[in-house]
């Protein structure tokens, strides 16, 4: 699974996921399913935000790659992917600037057009079940919830899907492709089934004990589908800024 994740996702997303797991004391070499889930969630958050801007009239517009209007205001502020201290700093700044109610839990995005925080969910289960779990945890009508599944289903607060249909279809297509690629490599069943995942985890731990001192040969082959899809969605005008702000950390 780890090899798949490194081939499938944009390097910046992989790096952010590694930092997040390290922050919570989790080992990505062991908890590979969680590594994949974090990368998937991060990518959906970035895809949700990319190419969406607010013009001078306050209307939401979509600006594709290469468009000269780079100075337009980004519609969404990305909170997910930052370390907790910086994330809360961003949330507090937004609340102070906009007057928004401070959420109890860290949200994933802030929508400057609709003036609301957004919680993004990506689930391997039924969307309505995951939606209810999110709603029960957050317990706030101020935070908008939007859930996506790997089967193309989605659910959002008051059926308000925020994005246009094409933008949402792009996210759904990406999730479906990730699922298909996992399935083709025999990874999907353990990713979606907790019992199978635990069995795989025990197998990984045993394998690590046996091969702790042995060199590991890693396959670098990437399927044609992944070569096409890998980081193509990333807004190149924003990548450098995101890398600088998200990955900044003191050198030890």
Swiss-Prot record:
The record marks 195, 198-199 as: Important for efficient shutoff activity and nuclear localization. InterPro entries: PA/PA-X, PA/PA-X_sf. Keywords: Decay of host mRNAs by virus, Eukaryotic host gene expression shutoff by virus, Host cytoplasm, Host gene expression shutoff by virus, Host mRNA suppression by virus, Host nucleus, Host-virus interaction. It comes from the Viruses. One of its GO terms (molecular function) is RNA binding. The active site is at residues 80, 108. It is found in: Host cytoplasm; Host nucleus. The keyword Ribosomal protein does not apply. Residues 207-217 have a biased composition (Polar residues). Signal peptide: none annotated. The record marks 28, 65, 202-203, 206 as: Important for efficient shutoff activity. It holds the Pfam family Flu_PA. Residues 202-221 are annotated as: Disordered. GO terms for biological process: viral RNA genome replication; viral translational frameshifting. Belongs to the influenza viruses PA-X family. The probable endonuclease active site in the N-terminus and the basic amino acid cluster in the C-terminus are important for the shutoff activity. The C-terminus acts as a nuclear localization signal. The C-terminus is recruited to host protein complexes involved in nuclear Pol II RNA processing. Plays a major role in the shutoff of the host protein expression by cleaving mRNAs probably via an endonuclease activity. This host shutoff allows the virus to escape from the host antiviral response. Hijacks host RNA splicing machinery to selectively target host RNAs containing introns for destruction. This may explain the preferential degradation of RNAs that have undergone co- or post-transcriptional processing. This is Protein PA-X. It comes from Influenza A virus (strain A/Fort Monmouth/1/1947 H1N1).
């Amino acid at each position: 699974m780890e090899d798949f994740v490194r081939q499938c996702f944009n390097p910046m997303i992989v790096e952010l996921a590694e930092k997040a797991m390290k922050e919570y004391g989790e080992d990505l070499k062991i908890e590979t399913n969680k590594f994949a889930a974090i990368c998937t969630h991060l990518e959906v958050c970035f895809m949700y935000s990319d190419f969406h801007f607010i013009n001078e009239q306050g209307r939401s517009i979509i600006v594709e790659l290469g468009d000269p209007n780079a100075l337009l205001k980004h519609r969404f502020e990305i909170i997910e992917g930052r370390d907790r201290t910086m994330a809360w700093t961003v949330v507090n700044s937004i609340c102070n600037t906009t007057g928004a109610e401070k959420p109890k839990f860290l949200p994933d995005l802030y929508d400057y057009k609709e003036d609301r925080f957004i919680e993004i969910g990506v689930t391997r289960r039924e969307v309505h079940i995951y939606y209810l779990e999110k709603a029960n945890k957050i317990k706030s009508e101020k935070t908008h919830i939007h859930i996506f599944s790997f089967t193309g289903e989605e659910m959002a607060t008051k059926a308000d899907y925020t994005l246009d249909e094409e933008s949402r279809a792009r996210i759904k297509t990406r999730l479906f492709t990730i699922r298909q690629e996992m399935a083709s490599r025999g990874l999907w069943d353990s990713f979606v089934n907790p019992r199978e995942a635990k069995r795989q985890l025990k197998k990984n731990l045993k394998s690590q004990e046996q091969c702790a001192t042995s060199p590991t040969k890693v396959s670098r082959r990437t399927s044609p589908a992944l070569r096409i899809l890998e980081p193509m969605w990333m807004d190149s005008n924003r990548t450098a800024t995101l890398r600088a702000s998200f990955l900044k950390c003191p050198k030890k």
